[in-house]
Amino acid sequence: MVIVPRVAIGVDTHAFESGRPCWVAGLHWPGQDGLAGHSDADVAAHAACNALLSAADLGDLGANFGVGQPEWSGASGVALLTESASRVRAAGYAIGNVSVQVIGNRPKIGSRRAEAQRVLSGAVGAPVSISAATTDGLGFPGRGEGLTGIAVALVYEAPDA
């Protein structure tokens, strides 16, 4: 049997919203402004969802958990990621890994990277790596207006599917 991998990229972007709790990479960041959105607006978890769903040809975050589905209003990124991984497996795919990069000035991911990787890997049921970058002051992330998450996911047909 030949295993044919499927790879997809996922992106998510949100603006900061004063007074909202900040959730990024499955972690709460006290003292930081949160991100505006239908759910917790966790750009890392949402980008991972988009990558996983796309790799399995299941659409995107909006099609699966969008504003037209009020039961997902306020949902945590970890809950959305857990459900996305479940849907990928139900479609007959196994998950190889996910890699996520958070782009923005804050919060500083590096000090909690291992913790974030544990949380997101637990949600996916497969390895998730996290990295971060700034834009050297360029664009909306550089101006401190919001964050972007970019992810890539590898899935393959499950041998017993």
Curated annotation (Swiss-Prot):
User: Which reaction is the catalytic activity of this chain?
Assistant: 4-CDP-2-C-methyl-D-erythritol 2-phosphate = 2-C-methyl-D-erythritol 2,4-cyclic diphosphate + CMP
**Is-annotated flag, keyword Metal-binding?**
yes
State which pathway it belongs to: Isoprenoid biosynthesis; isopentenyl diphosphate biosynthesis via DXP pathway; isopentenyl diphosphate from 1-deoxy-D-xylulose 5-phosphate: step 4/6
Do you know which PROSITE patterns this protein is assigned to?
ISPF
Site Transition state stabilizer: list residues.
Answer: H38, T134
What domain of life does the native source organism fall in?
Bacteria
Is Iron-sulfur found in the keyword set? no
| Top-level EC class | lyase
Annotated 4-CDP-2-C-methyl-D-erythritol 2-phosphate binding lies at D12, T13, H14, H38, S39, D60, L61, G62, F140, R143
Please state the Enzyme Commission number of this protein.
4.6.1.12
Cofactor(s) annotated in UniProt? a divalent metal cation
Q: Name one GO molecular function term.
A: metal ion binding
**Chain residues that bind a divalent metal cation:** D12, H14, H46
* Keyword entries, A-Z: Isoprene biosynthesis, Lyase, Metal-binding
Quote the record's cofactor note. Binds 1 divalent metal cation per subunit.
InterPro entries per record = MECDP_synthase, MECDP_synthase_CS, MECDP_synthase_sf
Please give a single GO biological process term from the UniProt record: isopentenyl diphosphate biosynthetic process, methylerythritol 4-phosphate pathway
Quaternary structure (record)? Homotrimer.
Q: What does this protein do?
A: Involved in the biosynthesis of isopentenyl diphosphate (IPP) and dimethylallyl diphosphate (DMAPP), two major building blocks of isoprenoid compounds. Catalyzes the conversion of 4-diphosphocytidyl-2-C-methyl-D-erythritol 2-phosphate (CDP-ME2P) to 2-C-methyl-D-erythritol 2,4-cyclodiphosphate (ME-CPP) with a corresponding release of cytidine 5-monophosphate (CMP).
Record-stated family: Belongs to the IspF family.
**Mind telling me what this protein is named?**
2-C-methyl-D-erythritol 2,4-cyclodiphosphate synthase
Q: Which gene encodes it?
A: ispF
